[in-house]
Amino acid sequence: MDGCHLSRDKLQGDGEGCDLKTSDYLKKYGVRLKKHLGQVFLSDDRIAKRIVKAAELTPEDVVVEIGAGAGTLTEELAKTGARVIAYEIDESLAPILQERLSKYPNVELRFEDFLKAKNVPEGAICVSNIPYNITGPLMEKIIEWKFKRAIVMIQKEVGERILAKPGKKTYGYLSVVVQTFYEVKKLFDVSRSCFVPNPEVDSTVVDLKRKPVDLDFEKFKKFVSMIFAKKRKTLKNNLRPFLSIFEGVDLSRRAEQLTVEEIVELYEKWRRALECSRG
């Protein structure tokens, strides 16, 4: 089978025979890709359809897409009848998006930087092909805006970090902050040949479902950053300014050896102690 094709675990291909609409649109409007934006556009409708199917959207849902690009995924989202709010920072893509989406009254295009967005509806569903160059900050924004669910396509390496378990080399800050607030499940891998232009790495689609967790995210990520600041050092080293708070706690282990639950327990102890010290 030519082009991007579906194997058991991975959508892949040789780059020929993929849906060429993305390339055609870019040529039609003379759009030049901007490297500093990490622009990698999905070019296979079948992948978009599979992602949207996994989201199980209804017309009552509000969907946020981060990085609409050339609109391949946006158009499939629009077909569900859900209210779609699509963010795109590159206004040169406006003619493409307007041509592809003008017949869908349920789509709202916002040409702005999602990282600076002020009025994102909380409790919405995020379905996106996340821009590679800002994956970490965008994952934090997904947590901050309390999306009840997120189905996102990200670099395979980042997917491995998000899914990592304690003791694994890839387990770290991103693993902990995402897994604290979301149940995380890998859906499938996507070959680099199914994008325009072809990136240097493959991608992974993950499904995040919000947990009923009530934590101050800003304080929590500060604590997690602190214990992972020097990954090979023990908790005793990384928490040295706060040793009195953790009297009686075994701090001989490294953060990468702790479960998410153990880290949350340490955080709560740290948070309560700081609040008491401030009166």
Swiss-Prot record:
PROSITE patterns: RRNA_A_DIMETH, SAM_RNA_A_N6_MT
Binding site for S-adenosyl-L-methionine: 42, 67, 88, 113, 129
GO MF term set: 16S rRNA (adenine(1518)-N(6)/adenine(1519)-N(6))-dimethyltransferase activity; RNA binding; rRNA (adenine-N6,N6-)-dimethyltransferase activity
EC number: 2.1.1.182
BP-aspect Gene Ontology terms: rRNA methylation
Pfam families with a match to the protein in the record: RrnaAD
Top-level taxonomic group: Bacteria
Cell compartments where the protein resides: Cytoplasm
Record's keyword annotation contains Cytoplasm: yes
A Gene Ontology cellular-component term: cytosol
Keywords, in A-Z order: Cytoplasm, Methyltransferase, RNA-binding, rRNA processing, S-adenosyl-L-methionine, Transferase
Record-linked InterPro entries: KsgA/Erm, rRNA_Ade_diMease-like_C, rRNA_Ade_Mease_Trfase_CS, rRNA_Ade_methylase_Trfase_N, rRNA_adenine_dimethylase, SAM-dependent_MTases_sf
Reaction(s) catalysed by this chain's protein: adenosine(1518)/adenosine(1519) in 16S rRNA + 4 S-adenosyl-L-methionine = N(6)-dimethyladenosine(1518)/N(6)-dimethyladenosine(1519) in 16S rRNA + 4 S-adenosyl-L-homocysteine + 4 H(+)
Role this protein plays: Specifically dimethylates two adjacent adenosines (A1518 and A1519) in the loop of a conserved hairpin near the 3'-end of 16S rRNA in the 30S particle. May play a critical role in biogenesis of 30S subunits.
NCBIfam families (alphabetical): ksgA (TIGR00755)
Protein family per UniProt: Belongs to the class I-like SAM-binding methyltransferase superfamily. rRNA adenine N(6)-methyltransferase family. RsmA subfamily.
The name this protein goes by in its record: Ribosomal RNA small subunit methyltransferase A
Lineage: Bacteria, Thermotogati, Thermotogota, Thermotogae, Thermotogales
Gene: rsmA
